[in-house]
Amino acid sequence: MMHYVNGNLLDTNCDYICHQVNCMGKMNSGVAKAIREKWPVVFKEYEELCESWHAWAYAHHAQEPEQHAASAMLGRVQLVQVKENQIVINLFGQGTFGYDGKRYTSYDAFWMGLGEIRKCVPVGNTIAFPYKVGCVRGGANWTIIETMITEALHDYEVYIYELEE
């Protein structure tokens, strides 16, 4: 079931906090930047994972290694424990990033990431997402993303956090 909450996602008591990340090892804006600042371990583990995928791509793909690294990472998730009873989920939903109004979120990757969440998060746990995850910075359509979350995670208590400004 989906619940909407006015408040700061980073103050949630949910078991899991899920946000979208790019495959370039950058957490320089939006929710990702806030998570990076509050829990540096999340960025450290994310950056290390991105570096290892990029090293693999450079070793095995002479042509367009960055593209190969991104395509290998899209749709995956990374779980990083930030408290005894709380884990941040990095959902690799966009290959690159930009600030030009284009859509960087891959709907296929986002959907696959939600499937990965179902595999590694036991039913009965609570999952928090930022309002318009993948939309504000990633350019996706919220109606599509919201429908995906509702369909994929219908067995979970999902909380959508909207930060009042």
Question: Predicted regions: what is each one?
Answer:
Residues 1-165:
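Macrodomain-like recognition of ADP-ribose-binding/processing modules
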